[in-house]
Amino acid sequence: MVFRLSRLVALFLGLTAAAHAHALKLSVTEATYNRETGRLELAVRLFADDLEEALTKDSGRRVPIDKPELLAPAASAYLRKHLTVKSAGGEVQSLSWSGAEVTATHVWLYAEVPLPGGLIGATFSVTFMHELFSDQLNSLQLRDGDFKQNLIFVDGTGEVTVRPKR
């Protein structure tokens, strides 16, 4: 009986851990260039539990994502640390925080960045969650009118420069 009970407890704990964790380690950043303003509008989707863990690790204190007054400054700093944009001239562009939206499973982070000259020749680096997961995949979906390009960043990718399509 004790053996059966311990197997049931082990099974329950295993199922609970499996349900909590997600096998897919992915962030998606939608980046749309606004020609009228000369700014790149960013929408970053991250798994809520991963972001909470990353913000807590980054700040050294627990950052609950359901507390906007704690989430905004921590997420803004995290975004600036893990997403860099350089103009075609090589100048690092400063991100302006626009806000966040929390759902049951994801958090959307919003920001804008000036990008003189547009996407072609701009350089990007995206390192979300690399401090937590060596198999993290970060997708950056770029749009400027009819121009669309998807850049993929894994641990060690470094910077990627946008080139015109041939």
What are these model-predicted stretches?
Residues 1, 21-22:
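Absolute protein N-terminus
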Residues 1-12:
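Bacterial N-terminal signal peptides that target proteins for export
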Residues 12-21:
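Hydrophobic h-region of N-terminal signal peptides that target proteins for export
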Residues 22-166:
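N-terminal soluble domains immediately following signal/targeting peptides that reside
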